[in-house]
């Protein structure tokens, strides 16, 4: 019999475990649910249950992700864990499960490894706001100075990728010992889990809700209402909009057009305000039907700008995932689906030493679109060719 759902009275936050394979991400996830279950704040989810992660689809890509939930005194957490390295890469690039904070798991026996670096780099590129380190398997290292060394290495690595490596919390423990500990919250083997949760509560900042960000709505459709003017429809991506507010139409050229949203409607009813997540129609003052089109965005003036050239981290689908069967090189020209825009672009540059990109690769490349689109760092998009998705990307740097 399933337990009733948690009552959501506490602020909610999305977190996840990241790090190198076999460093203990999944065991740590299990240990957290075990500890919280002792207070009735979670259902204990053992390792085996987390490890057989169900498949999800995001932007045409199949990803295995496990979601668990637990609470502390302060917050309600939704926690994601992925079984395979490729699943992490795909999740972070598609944004299938967003993270407001990440727990970087590093084994004391190994220190930072290649996937540790890759996950940290991606966390930086997709704007994960904060990171906490859990040094795992400390019971398997006899010399505490070795653990100190691992901690220094991890802090250096995080600083290199612009996280506050000197300041962020580093917890030491053994996830396996915690899972195997008796059901006593004061047991010494569970102390590290308590420390980790306390650090999450105090160090992870409250997420900025989408409604608190500047208004932005991708244009899905445009039509004219006789005698009233031009209406654009779409789903508000962030922020709040009220009638009478100034907005900009951005995209398709470097010129942006100012307008005033004179009316906001939902299901043919006028609204005093609409917010992130709402599907609405906005009546635009002084805009002809041919001055606005699908693929542009309506946004708070000055909050986002149009660009043609940018760097992006792209995961290229494998043949088995429905992607390309062959590699591509510089000069490849697929379609980029950026919000509602469907625009041709060219891969104008690849990293030094990379001649071709193989299906299954994850590569940072430079892209130039044929016309400017409203773009910002950390934004996700799909890469398509001949009607099928061949890749998923995230903008890592704006060039022009």
From Swiss-Prot:
List of residues binding Mg(2+): 26
Task: Name the SUPFAM superfamilies for this protein.
Answer: EF-Tu/eEF-1alpha/eIF2-gamma C-terminal domain, P-loop containing nucleoside triphosphate hydrolases, Translation proteins
Region listing for G1, in residue ranges: 19-26
Alphabetized InterPro entries for the sequence: EF-Tu_GTP-bd, EF-Tu_GTPase, EFTu-like_2, EFTU_2, G_TR_CS, P-loop_NTPase, Small_GTP-bd, T_Tr_GTP-bd_dom
* Residues covered by region (G3): 81-84
Q: What is its EC number?
A: 3.6.5.3
Q: Give binding positions for GTP.
A: 19-26, 81-85, 136-139
Region entry G5, spans: 174-176
Domain named tr-type G: residues: 10-208
Q: Which PROSITE patterns match?
A: G_TR_1 (PS00301), G_TR_2 (PS51722)
**Catalytic function, reaction form:** GTP + H2O = GDP + phosphate + H(+)
Q: Where is this region: G4?
A: 136-139
Query: Which locations, inside or outside the cell, does it occupy?
Result: Cytoplasm
Q: What class of enzyme is it?
A: hydrolase
Cross-referenced Pfam families: GTP_EFTU, GTP_EFTU_D2, GTP_EFTU_D3
Region G2: start and end of each range? 60-64
Entry keywords, A to Z: Cytoplasm, Elongation factor, GTP-binding, Hydrolase, Magnesium, Metal-binding, Nucleotide-binding, Protein biosynthesis
Keyword Protein biosynthesis annotated: yes
Q: What is its main location?
A: cytoplasm
Q: Name one GO molecular function term.
A: GTP binding
Quaternary structure note:
Monomer.
The record's section on NCBIfam families has: EF-Tu, PRK00049.1, PRK12735.1, PRK12736.1, small_GTP
Instruction: Give the protein's biological function.
Output: GTP hydrolase that promotes the GTP-dependent binding of aminoacyl-tRNA to the A-site of ribosomes during protein biosynthesis.
Q: Which protein family is named in the record?
A: Belongs to the TRAFAC class translation factor GTPase superfamily. Classic translation factor GTPase family. EF-Tu/EF-1A subfamily.
Q: What is this protein called?
A: Elongation factor Tu
